[in-house]
Amino acid sequence: MEKLEMLYEGKAKQIYATDKADEVVIYYKDDATAFNGEKKGQITDKGVMNNKITSILFEQLEKQGIKTHFIKKLNDREQLCKKVSIVPLEVIVRNVAAGSMAKRLGLEEGTKLKTTVFEFSYKDDELGDPLINSYHAVAIGAATFEEIDTILEMTAKINNILKEAFAKENINLIDFKIEFGKCADGTIVLADEISPDTCRFWDATTGEKLDKDRFRRDLGNVEDAYIEILKRISK
């Protein structure tokens, strides 16, 4: 496999072409952003840790029947993945009220929800990734109703697998956001990453935040939180 030109650079990753048309290399950066890019910084070795965490979790999900874009981890910062067309939706899963949902609905952070909440945001930086529903998604051509059903079914399974896996490591999975892509044959697969950048992890005993909220809210010890998550799931 030969790594070729950069195809795309986002806030946290770079995507490179390879000598295989259906495979790409994803490089994880140390750049950190919050509040739709209003706050920017660097977290030492974040890219290394997120690459390792995502690789471990995607391998676990694959073993339990979840199709992903992940092929293999290449080195500390890079992984080889299937080339996909990203569905322009972020799927947000909320098991406990926190962050923007708690603020939006006037709930105390940490409030247990009577059911898991699934939300969609439309991936558009200029618009600030607005919340939309499935009808909006279909109306603007982001996905079909059939694709939405597939995505929600996969997301529910992913949530159950991850909640159980993290509970074994004394971590509560408060909420997370994921993205999906379509392969050349139309198959929908889990894409992007699952890491402390995209999830809220709270220690089940102390309630300590072990995720990017430490950067967002200037709580300090940001790197230590990422290291702790990697340490627990690497056992």
Curated annotation (Swiss-Prot):
Pfam families: SAICAR_synt (PF01259). Pathway: Purine metabolism; IMP biosynthesis via de novo pathway; 5-amino-1-(5-phospho-D-ribosyl)imidazole-4-carboxamide from 5-amino-1-(5-phospho-D-ribosyl)imidazole-4-carboxylate: step 1/2. CDD domains: SAICAR_synt_PurC. GO terms for biological process: 'de novo' IMP biosynthetic process; cobalamin biosynthetic process. Its EC number is 6.3.2.6. The keyword Secreted does not apply. Keywords: ATP-binding, Ligase, Nucleotide-binding, Purine biosynthesis. It comes from the Bacteria. It catalyses: 5-amino-1-(5-phospho-D-ribosyl)imidazole-4-carboxylate + L-aspartate + ATP = (2S)-2-[5-amino-1-(5-phospho-beta-D-ribosyl)imidazole-4-carboxamido]succinate + ADP + phosphate + 2 H(+). The keyword Flavoprotein does not apply. GO terms for molecular function: ATP binding; phosphoribosylaminoimidazolesuccinocarboxamide synthase activity. Belongs to the SAICAR synthetase family. This is Phosphoribosylaminoimidazole-succinocarboxamide synthase. It comes from Clostridium botulinum (strain Eklund 17B / Type B). The gene is purC.
